[in-house]
């Protein structure tokens, strides 16, 4: 749940409202919840049945065949993750820079680029060593996030105005093509806010009684975050009229909407304190993400399923420095784009291989390995899996065509890279593999 509660709730509300130009955009957030709950059942079945570390990398290999198409799917997962992981980190950098704009009055675009670069380099430098435990980091991150969240919710509850919160524009629910395109955009923002609901699956071998704990962890964390995010959404839109920060691109103050809210209610001094808390939360979040994400390409390379370069350890400090530098550098560059573009690219890049791939994978395993031990079996199978699949297709299809082409292009390049790598190592499909 900690990874689900970084800077997300403080930076996405203007984007969410801008997607459909009004509070009806919260419908997209509900659609995202339905998709995530159904997809969470997919993760739960896979995680409970195969509770080793690796998550998607492990599940995709087993579902599609570890020495054949599973190698391709595992490779493509890591390939897209080298981009989608940094995109997620970059969203935190962007959020950090946006809220810094409340304190740094008149911050220019060039200043934002410099600030993101400095924060990104500091993040890499702090992680350029062996770190045995992130318990202290996680606790401090969670404490800062919880304090800020509770403060925002309490302030919103005491000043909530339903007329402001539910001020729907004319034709808010006309169900036109534009309505569904906007719904798709709002859903992508909602899914971004939920990202991390599956993180327990990446440490499955460290979980006691995974068949019981993993499904419960996914359900409880998703439900808790849904309630918290809904409360934050209502706290803000019930205090500040949405027309004052929609569209987000035309209202610079939308970059630090929580700071604006606190300033109106309690003055600039309290707003500055909350801004500093959000900056702390944002940095703690990107620190934890870069630490965890830099280990995924390393683990894949070490097990022989990705380029060996990413499996290199620092000669004296014994940490995956190549993977850290690559993920860290891409994160900085990705931070130069707009938050909306970064979120769209992040979600679309993960959909095809990771999310849709796993839905298909759980169905393949049901057919190919009916006797596999499944401590948790998806309720009402295959309905949740099909709902998740249709949801991912909807989110993908309603994305800007340029982002779709970008996502497909990334996977196409990954396919070419896989073939070149397999040819150089004489592995499948260039070497016969026993069935």
Regions found by a protein language model. Name each.
Residues 309-319, 355-404, 427-434:
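C-terminal membrane-solvent junction of multi-pass transporters and transport-like membrane proteins
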Residues 148-155, 297, 346-374, 410-430:
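Hydrophobic alpha-helical segments of multi-pass membrane transport proteins
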Residues 26, 107-111, 139-275:
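Helix-loop-helix junctions that connect adjacent transmembrane segments
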Residues 97, 111-162, 177, 195, ...:
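Membrane-interface loop-to-helix entry segments
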Residues 13, 58-66, 101-106, 217, ...:
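TM-loop-TM module centered on a large, flexible mid-protein loop between adjacent transmembrane helices
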Residues 1, 26, 66-82, 115-119, ...:
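Select transmembrane alpha-helical segments in multipass membrane proteins
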Residues 15, 37-120, 125-128, 278-299, ...:
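Hydrophobic transmembrane alpha-helices that form the core helical bundles
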Residues 15-21, 25, 91-112, 131-142, ...:
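Transmembrane helix-loop boundary segments of multi-pass membrane transporters
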């Amino acid at each position: 749940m900690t990874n689900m509660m970084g800077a997300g709730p403080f930076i996405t509300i203007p984007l969410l409202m801008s997607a459909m130009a009004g509070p009806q955009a919260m419908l997209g957030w509900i659609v995202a919840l339905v998709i995530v709950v159904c997809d969470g059942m997919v993760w739960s079945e896979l995680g409970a049945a195969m509770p080793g570390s690796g998550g998607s990398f492990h599940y995709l290999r087993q579902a599609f065949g570890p020495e054949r198409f599973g190698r391709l799917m595992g490779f493509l997962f890591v390939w897209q993750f080298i981009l989608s992981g940094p995109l997620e980190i970059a969203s935190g950098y962007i959020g950090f820079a946006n809220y810094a704009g409340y304190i740094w009055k008149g911050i220019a675009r060039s200043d934002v680029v410099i600030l993101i670069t400095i924060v990104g380099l500091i993040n890499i430098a702090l992680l350029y060593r062996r770190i045995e435990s992130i318990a202290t980091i996680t606790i401090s991150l969670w404490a800062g996030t919880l304090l800020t969240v509770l403060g925002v919710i309490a302030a919103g509850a005491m000043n909530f105005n339903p007329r402001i919160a539910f001020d729907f524009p004319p034709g808010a629910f006309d169900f036109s093509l534009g309505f569904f395109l906007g719904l798709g955009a709002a859903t992508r923002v909602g899914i971004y806010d939920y990202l991390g609901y599956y993180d327990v699956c990446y440490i499955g071998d460290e979980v006691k009684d995974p068949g019981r704990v993993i499904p419960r962890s996914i359900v409880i964390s998703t439900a808790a975050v849904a309630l918290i995010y809904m409360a934050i959404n209502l706290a803000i839109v019930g205090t500040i009229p949405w027309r004052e920060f929609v569209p987000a691109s035309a209202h610079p103050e939308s970059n630090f909407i929580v700071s604006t809210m606190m300033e109106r209610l309690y003055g600039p001094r309290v707003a500055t304190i909350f801004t500093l808390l959000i900056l702390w939360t944002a940095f703690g979040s990107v620190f934890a993400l870069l630490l965890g994400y830099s280990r995924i390409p390393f683990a894949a390379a070490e097990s022989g399923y990705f380029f060996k370069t990413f499996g290199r350890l620092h000669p004296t400090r014994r940490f995956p420095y190549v993977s850290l530098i690559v993920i860290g550098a891409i994160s900085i560059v990705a931070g130069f784009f707009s938050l909306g573009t970064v979120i769209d690219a992040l979600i679309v890049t993960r959909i095809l291989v990771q999310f849709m791939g796993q839905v298909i994978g759980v169905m393949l395993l049901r057919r190919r390995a009916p006797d596999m031990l499944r401590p948790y079996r998806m309720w009402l199978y295959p309905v949740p899996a099909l709902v998740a699949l249709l949801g991912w297709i909807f989110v993908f299809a309603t994305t800007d065509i340029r982002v779709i082409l970008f996502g497909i292009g990334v996977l196409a390049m990954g396919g070419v890279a896989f073939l070149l790598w397999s040819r150089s190592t004489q592995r499948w499909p260039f070497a016969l593999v026993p069935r």
